[in-house]
A protein has these predicted regions:
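Catalytic phosphate/metal-binding cores of nucleic-acid and nucleotide-processing enzymes, i.e., regions
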Residues: 1-142
């Protein structure tokens, strides 16, 4: 199976997936994807779509607190600090993907989680752009 190596290929793979999902819809009516990786949100969407293209599953993890209107302040989410932005599974292998754009750096809590995931047999990766992430994933599955 060919795997995406860059955003252009990921968009093509994603379009093929959509064509398969909507086989009764004419091709011209199927929306084309325009995935980018300039912001954290865009890169996160790319990675989740990449997991789907590779036959896996992935979920975005929201560790942000919840605004309590009654109290007028934010409450902690209850999620453990340092959990990766994306968790996913491909062929039974657990992945924890931390998305970092620009000068964003890994926190001490995130380093602890990285060690725990690796010690448990999972794979942890810090994604800064889609191309480097795709090279890493293609190396894992080569």
């Amino acid at each position: 199976m060919n795997l995406p190596r860059d955003l252009k290929e990921l968009n093509a793979f994603a379009f093929e997936l959509n064509c398969g999902k909507y086989s009764s819809v004419p091709e011209f009516a199927i929306p084309k994807t325009n995935l980018k990786d300039k912001t954290s949100n865009e890169l996160t969407k790319c990675i989740i779509k990449d997991f789907e293209v590779r036959g896996g599953i992935a979920y975005r993890i929201n560790t942000m607190g919840i605004y309590d209107e009654k109290r007028g302040k934010w409450r902690k989410s209850g999620m453990r600090k340092g959990i990766p932005d994306i968790i996913g599974i491909i062929d039974g292998t657990f992945f924890g993907i931390e998305v970092k754009i620009g000068r964003d750096k890994q926190s001490a809590d995130q380093r602890v989680i990285e060690l725990e995931i690796n010690e448990a047999g999972g794979i942890y990766y810090i994604a800064k752009n889609y191309k480097d992430y795709a090279e890493f994933m293609n190396a894992v599955f080569s």
